[in-house]
Design a protein with these regions (language model features):
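Short, solvent-exposed loop/beta-turn-alpha elements that line the ligand-binding surface or hinge
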Residues: 47-50, 65-90, 138-139, 152-161, ...
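Paired acidic/hydrophobic, glycine-rich loop segments that form the ligand-binding mouth/hinge
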Residues: 124-129, 146
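C-terminal capping/gating helix-and-loop segments adjacent to ligand/active sites or protein-protein/ligand interfaces
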Residues: 163, 206-209, 224-268
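Extracytoplasmic/periplasmic substrate-recognition and gating elements
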Residues: 138-203, 253
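Extracytoplasmic/periplasmic solute-binding protein
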Residues: 24-77, 123
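A structural signal for short loop-to-beta-strand junctions that line the ligand-binding cleft
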Residues: 1-7, 41, 156-162, 233-241
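Short helix-initiation/N-cap motifs at beta->coil->alpha
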Residues: 18-24, 105-120
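Glycine-centered hinge/linker elements that transmit conformational signals in sensory
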Residues: 26-28, 72-108
């Protein structure tokens, strides 16, 4: 997520960022003149406490998995080869180097810390998703916000936004037949009726993939559609194939130690 106003204050526009190399060049420059710009860093803190670490042990970790799966033409595997771990390191290095704080502080930084840094204008870039729109819209107008791909240095010219879901509606099969049917009817109403789709779109910020649904007011969702219409390829969420939460926690611990300078990238 990008603060376009701060980006322009630094002398850049979105057109200047079309690849990882571009992003690094811009972020490094912003970091070098952060005091003159009146900010604390190019990126908000990559918080590694439990409220925030999922952004890096899951969502950022999705990128090397996605590109490996894409290259091999698969959608799951027993073990990744690690083909794109160097690119993963490059992005994480950028996050912790061009940051609002020192890497040693990230273990205690929270999701609220990162959001507040962005809301307060302390940083230009903030890795998060469309679900943050409602909070950010309290401070910024749509014209001030943009979402750009997490450029990974692999296929940047064709890369769109990372899109997907890991949440699903489920109905308890052990409930009464009457309750099961009532639940299914309600779920159908939510995604087909005018009131239901309006609530899900405007109040909840969801994308509803049906022609009759209310168009989303969420500017990030609109921008995702624009990227896709322009021919860019959405990055699918393949992190749902990660073995377990324990696996992700181990990765998170390794990332935290690396950021603090007390652990090697080899552990990652």
């Amino acid at each position: 997520i990008t603060n376009k106003t701060l980006l322009e204050k630094a002398g850049y526009t979105l057109d200047d960022i079309k690849s990882f190399d571009d992003l690094k060049k811009v972020a490094d420059d912003i970091q070098s003149k952060k005091d003159d710009l009146g900010i604390k860093g190019a990126f908000t803190s990559a918080g590694m406490d439990g409220s925030s670490d999922w952004r890096f042990k899951t969502h950022l970790a999705n990128l090397p998995i996605y590109y490996e799966y894409k290259e091999d033409g698969i959608d799951d595997t027993e073990a990744i080869k690690g083909t794109y771990l160097d690119q993963y390191k490059n992005v994480f290095d950028l996050y912790i180097t061009d940051s609002t704080c020192d890497g040693s502080e990230l273990s205690a930084k929270t999701a609220d810390d990162s959001r507040n840094e962005f809301v307060n204008g302390d940083a230009v870039f903030y890795q998060n998703g469309s679900w943050e729109y409602a909070e950010l819209a309290k401070t910024y107008s749509d014209d001030e916000l943009a979402m750009i791909p997490i450029y990974f240095g692999v296929d940047d010219e064709n890369e769109g936004l990372a899109t997907g879901t890991e949440n699903y509606w489920c109905v308890n099969k052990n409930a009464s037949e009457e309750d099961v049917q009532a639940t299914l009817d309600f779920m159908n109403w939510c995604v087909t009726s005018e009131a239901g789709t309006k609530s899900m779109s405007e109040d909840m910020g969801f994308t509803i993939p049906f022609k009759t649904a209310e168009a989303p007011s969420n500017v990030f969702v609109k921008q995702d559609a624009e990227y896709t219409e322009a021919g860019l390829t959405p990055v699918s969420w393949n992190f749902t194939t990660i073995p377990s939460e324990e696996w992700k926690n181990t990765l998170g611990s390794a990332l935290t130690a690396y950021a603090a300078g007390s652990g090697s990238w080899d552990y990652v």
